[in-house]
């Protein structure tokens, strides 16, 4: 039985005496002579064996699904409910569009001498409006604050207050306006950014899987000259 050192010498001798063509691919010239490398990276081969065509199809399909739904979900903005223009009145005639009506809706008087703002008389009779949209409620608050500020700043229209009160009301109106816009926009922008990042990640994974399947990920050292030596 030969010692390990003798086996090392045998391997070195085989490497030095190996005859290879100068134009052969995957040849690395080192200190001991030309060494033939495997045609593919072993890591890439194992990865190709693990990844099947079903997994690649699932990744590509999921990426297409996410990219198609990102635009639609980001563009879907809840709108205020619109009244039903085709609903029939008690007399049997359909309601006309409120926007085309020239009559001004008047509040229905109540028994105590006041008015009931929830019930409005239109062309075809009394109609109770539906629940108002939160955006419209916030806009009504902003208009009310603006009207109060106009009364405070305009002489002769109301009691004058000190500058601190005016500044506080103006700051409150600005906070209401900014909050109403931020609450409606920030979550949509965040959702859109998350969907775009997810789509890019899945696109990169799908592209990497496809390219790795064709064997483009190979770690092959650059071929050096046969005349290379440590002294150069």
UniProtKB/Swiss-Prot annotation:
Encoding gene, per UniProt annotation: ORF8
Annotated disulfide bonds: none
Lipid bilayer topology: Multi-pass membrane protein
Principal location listed in the UniProt entry: membrane
Native organism taxonomy: Viruses, Duplodnaviria, Heunggongvirae, Peploviricota, Herviviricetes
Name of this protein: Putative membrane protein ORF8
Region (Disordered) residue spans: 71-121
Localization annotation: Membrane
Keywords, in A-Z order: Membrane, Transmembrane, Transmembrane helix
Annotated Low complexity bias: 71-84
TM stretches of this protein: 166-182, 195-211
């Amino acid at each position: 039985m030969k010692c390990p050192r003798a086996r090392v010498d045998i391997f070195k001798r085989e490497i030095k005496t190996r005859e290879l063509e100068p134009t052969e691919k995957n040849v690395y010239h080192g200190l001991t002579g030309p060494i033939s490398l495997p045609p593919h990276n072993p890591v890439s081969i194992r990865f190709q064996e693990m990844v099947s065509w079903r997994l690649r199809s699932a990744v590509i399909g999921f990426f297409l699904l996410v990219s198609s739904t990102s635009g639609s979900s980001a563009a879907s903005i809840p709108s205020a409910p619109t009244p039903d223009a085709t609903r029939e009145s008690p007399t049997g005639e359909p309601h006309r569009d409120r926007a085309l009506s020239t009559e001004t809706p008047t509040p229905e008087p109540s028994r105590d001498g006041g008015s009931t703002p929830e019930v409005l008389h239109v062309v075809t009779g009394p109609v109770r409006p539906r629940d108002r949209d939160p955006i419209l409620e916030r806009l009504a608050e902003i208009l009310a604050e603006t009207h109060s500020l106009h009364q405070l700043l305009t002489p002769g229209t109301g009691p004058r207050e000190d500058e601190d009160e005016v500044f506080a009301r103006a700051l409150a109106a600005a906070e209401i306006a900014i909050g109403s816009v931020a609450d409606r926009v920030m979550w949509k922008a965040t959702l859109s950014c998350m969907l775009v990042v997810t789509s890019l990640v899945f696109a990169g994974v799908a592209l990497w899987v496809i390219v790795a399947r064709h064997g483009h990920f190979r770690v092959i050292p650059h071929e050096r000259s046969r005349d290379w030596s440590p002294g150069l």
